[in-house]
């Protein structure tokens, strides 16, 4: 597949702006904004937004996903769990930015992530001591943190070696290095899956990724095509 650098407009979720490209901490690459959305819960019959989430992908994602998914509509992609599985398990770098709209403690956030990841692993029959250890490292990294509105948790999902770089971003320009690196392919994939997977916590981000990637893939020429 012929491929040039992917360029898409920024996205604004509430008061949070996600730029069209980002250079994640711990990475030498610039990734494009694949989609963004909010995460919230209905409380007393009102929908309360807690976080805004942006998902970035390496350009390699386009040539990797294209042969299988080119020509599908946004609705086709949004309703196909295999499409999103190809994203969070794909051999390309991903970056997830989670910006607080409501204040959260590190303990609150990490316990919810643990709940989602462990439930997924147990359902898949893949929960082992290695996954349990990775989650404990994640909880340890977050436990003393506080996240007022406007602060962000950054996840760099690296491929080689398979690892998850965790960064806490409070103000100014994006940090170049992370706070913690956890060498766990399973945790790296599970965190992104918990956001845009079959039971993902941000349906808005999921729809946004489907819409933007449908448009990108439609514009890309497959190798050998005229």
UniProtKB/Swiss-Prot annotation:
Keyword Isomerase: yes
UniProt KW Cell membrane keyword: no
A molecular function (GO) term: chalcone isomerase activity
This enzyme's EC code(s): 5.5.1.6
Name of this chain's protein: Chalcone--flavanone isomerase
Assigned keywords, A-Z: Flavonoid biosynthesis, Isomerase
Catalytic activity: a chalcone = a flavanone
Name of the coding gene: CHI
InterPro entries: CFI, Chalcone_isomerase, Chalcone_isomerase_3-sand, Chalcone_isomerase_bundle_sf, Chalcone_isomerase_sf
Other comments on record: Part of the biosynthetic pathway for all classes of flavonoids, a large class of secondary plant metabolites, many of which are brightly colored.
Pfam families in alphabetical order: Chalcone
GO biological process, one term: flavonoid biosynthetic process
Binding-site residues for substrate, renumbered to this chain: 51, 116, 194
Family, similarity comment: Belongs to the chalcone isomerase family.
Pathway the protein acts in: Secondary metabolite biosynthesis; flavonoid biosynthesis
Site residues (Important for catalytic activity), renumbered to this chain: 109
Physiological role: Catalyzes the intramolecular cyclization of bicyclic chalcones into tricyclic (S)-flavanones. Responsible for the isomerization of 4,2',4',6'-tetrahydroxychalcone (also termed chalcone) into naringenin.
